[in-house]
Amino acid sequence: MRVKKLVMYLIFCLIPCAIFSQSTIALTLPVVTLLDIEPAGTFTLNFTAPTEAGQSLTTPTANTTKWVNYTSAIASGGLTRRITASVNQVIPGVSIRVQAATASGAGGGVLGTSSGLVTLSTTAANIITGIGGAFTGTGANNGHRLTISLAVNTYANLSARTNTPIVITYTITE
């Protein structure tokens, strides 16, 4: 009887251990840095001339149709990322401004923080900081909504112009 118990013990206890197996997988998580402005395309901001002498120019309504989308996977212990903006040219007497809203939509992770209202120049300025491992979702209504506006800063420097192209360059960097 003792032999029978020993055989049963071997069958039920040791055999399951003998069929246990392991696998080793190689995992790669790349460093990712992607940025997009959605939707694509241009928009127009035009000052309106006054209709009566002594009145100031009417400032155009700010554009709020553009969204910053990004994906960021940083190296272990790596620096957070930031998004900068600059313009290809400044217009004398006019401030070109951008403000990124708080991130919203389908994203997740350590999303960046808006730097508030930033007046753009030909030198890159931070508009979003503190981006860690994150994604915003894609397209409009995901990421950070941009408010792009114009303001007169010095009337003495204004000169008439028509259809002057201003290119805003956005860059994601560490």
Spans of model-derived segments:
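N-terminal small/polar-rich segments of proteins
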Residues: Q22-G112, A125-E174
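Exoplasmic/lumenal beta-rich domain surfaces
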Residues: S114-L117
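Bacterial Sec-dependent N-terminal signal peptides
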Residues: M1-A26
